[in-house]
Design a protein with these regions (language model features):
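Hydrophobic faces of well-ordered beta-strands that scaffold small-molecule active sites
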Residues: 54-60, 95-97, 132-137, 166-168, ...
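N-terminal secretory signal peptides
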Residues: 1-17
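Boundary/entry segment of secreted carbohydrate-active catalytic domains
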Residues: 48-80
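Short, acidic/polar
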Residues: 70-86, 144-156, 276-283, 321
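Acidic/histidine-rich catalytic cores of soluble enzymes
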Residues: 195-313
Length: 369
C-alpha cells in the first residue's frame, strides 16, 4: 500500500505549525499563506462554480517526482498508472502530460511515447475516468522532412491518448526582436495547420519574459538591431501574427502575473520611459477562444523576490482566480491545469507533491464567482 493519505491539515497540527510555517518549511515560501486560500473566496453575491468538475486538471510536471520514482524502492505512488490512480481518486478529471517517460521499473516500462505505450496509457486513462487534454512536448525549430515526420508521429500518439491539444512548455522564441518572432509565427502557422489536419489544436505556453516588450524601434545598436520599443509585448505580437484557426495559447497565469509585476515600463522611440501595466485577464478576454488551456498556478506575493511572487498550492496564494476567470469570459469552457513547479519535496518530503495535489483540487472545487 502506498502511503499517500496524509492529511496536510492534520500534519500541520501534529507538527505544531501554522499554515505559514508549514508551507515555508516544505516549499520555501516565506510569505504568509491564509488558511482558506485567497482563490477559494467567493466574490460577494457570486456563487457559480468557476471550474466545472470535468475540467479540473493537472499537468504531470507538478508530480514529476512521483512519475519518475522507482516503485521497487518507494512506498509512495510511482509511475504513470499509480500516480494517475491517485489523481483520479482525488477528483481530477483532466491530465496534461509533460512528456511520456517514467521510471523503467514502473508498469509499462520507461517510454510510453510509442504506439504500444500510448495504447496502454490510454487504457489506464479510460479505466480511471481521466481525459488527456495536452502534452508539453516540442514543436520543431525548423521545417524539414525529418521534423515534419516526427511532428506527425507526435500527433498520432496524441490522438491515441485522446488529446484535443498538442503543445510545448517553452516560449516560441526567447528573442526580443520582431524578425525572430515573425519567423516563429510562420513556423507555428505551418505546424499548427498540420496539427489541425490531425484534429488537434497546437498551443504554446508562456513564461514572464514572453510578455515583456519587443525591441522594435529607436536607435540601432552596433549589430543593427533596434534598442527601443513601441510598447508591443512579445507574445501579443505572436498572437496577432498567427492564424487563429491553427495556433492557440495556454496562458500560465502565474507567469503572466509575474510579467505584470516585472515588465511595467519600456523605453519609447523618443527615449522617454512609458508605463504600461500588463492585464492578463484583459488579454485573454479579447480572444478568449484562443486560450483553450490555462496553467492555474498560484503564488504568494513577495516583493523581496525578483518575480514578486513565490509559488504555492492553488488557492493558497494571492492571485485572484475568481476575478480572473469571471473576466476572461466563456465561463466553464477553458481547461485549467493546476501546476506548481515547486511541489516535489525531494527526499525530505516524498509525498508532498501528491498532498499539494489534494489541497489544490479542494480549492479548485471551492472556487466560486
Amino acid at each position: 500500500m502506498h502511503d499517500n493519505d496524509v492529511n496536510p491539515l492534520k500534519l500541520v497540527s501534529k507538527l505544531g505549525l501554522n499554515r505559514r510555517q508549514f508551507f515555508a518549511a516544505t516549499t520555501g515560501v516565506a510569505a504568509a499563506v491564509t488558511l482558506t486560500g485567497t482563490a477559494a473566496k467567493a466574490a460577494p453575491g457570486a456563487n457559480g462554480v468557476l471550474i466545472p468538475a470535468p475540467r479540473r486538471g493537472i499537468i504531470l510536471y507538478t508530480v514529476r517526482d512521483a512519475v519518475g520514482r522507482d516503485p521497487l524502492t518507494s512506498p509512495y505512488a510511482s509511475g504513470f498508472k499509480e500516480v494517475l490512480t491517485e489523481l483520479s481518486s482525488i477528483g481530477y478529471r483532466q491530465i496534461e502530460f509533460a512528456g511520456l517517460r517514467q521510471h523503467a521499473n514502473a508498469e509499462g516500462g520507461a517510454d510510453l511515447g510509442t504506439v504500444a505505450g500510448a495504447t496502454q496509457l490510454r487504457a489506464w486513462l479510460d479505466d480511471l475516468g481521466l481525459q488527456a487534454e495536452g502534452n508539453h512536448g516540442s514543436v520543431p525549430s525548423t521545417i524539414t522532412d525529418a521534423n515534419i515526420a516526427a511532428f506527425d508521429t507526435a500527433c498520432e500518439i496524441a490522438n491515441i491518448l485522446g488529446m484535443g491539444h498538442i503543445g510545448t512548455g517553452s516560449d516560441p522564441t526567447s528573442s526580443a526582436y520582431v524578425a525572430d518572432w515573425e519567423a516563429a509565427a510562420a513556423r507555428w502557422d505551418f505546424y499548427g495547420e498540420r496539427a489541425s489536419r490531425h484534429g488537434l489544436k497546437l498551443y504554446t505556453h508562456n513564461h514572464d519574459i514572453a510578455y515583456s516588450f519587443l525591441l522594435d524601434s529607436g536607435p540601432l545598436d552596433a549589430t543593427g538591431r533596434p534598442t527601443r520599443s513601441s510598447g508591443i509585448r512579445r507574445l501579443e505580437h505572436f498572437l496577432a501574427n498567427t492564424d487563429p484557426k491553427h495556433v492557440y495559447l495556454e496562458m500560465d497565469i502565474y507567469w503572466a502575473h509575474v510579467a505584470q509585476y516585472k515588465h511595467r515600463t519600456f523605453t519609447a522611440p523618443d527615449g522617454s520611459t512609458v508605463q504600461s501595466v500588463f492585464d492578463p485577464a484583459g488579454l485573454v478576454a479579447a480572444q478568449t477562444t484562443r486560450y483553450p488551456l490555462f496553467h492555474a498556478k498560484d503564488g504568494v506575493k513577495d516583493t523581496t523576490q525578483a518575480n514578486g511572487y513565490v509559488m504555492a498550492p492553488f488557492g493558497e496564494g494571492d492571485i485572484d482566480y475568481s476575478t480572473f476567470l469571471r473576466r476572461v469570459g466563456a465561463k466553464g469552457s477553458h481547461n485549467p491545469m493546476w501546476e506548481q513547479d515547486t511541489a516535489p519535496g525531494g527526499s525530505a518530503a516524498p509525498g508532498q507533491s501528491l498532498e499539494f495535489a489534494r489541497v489544490s483540487y479542494a480549492n479548485m472545487a471551492a472556487l466560486r464567482g
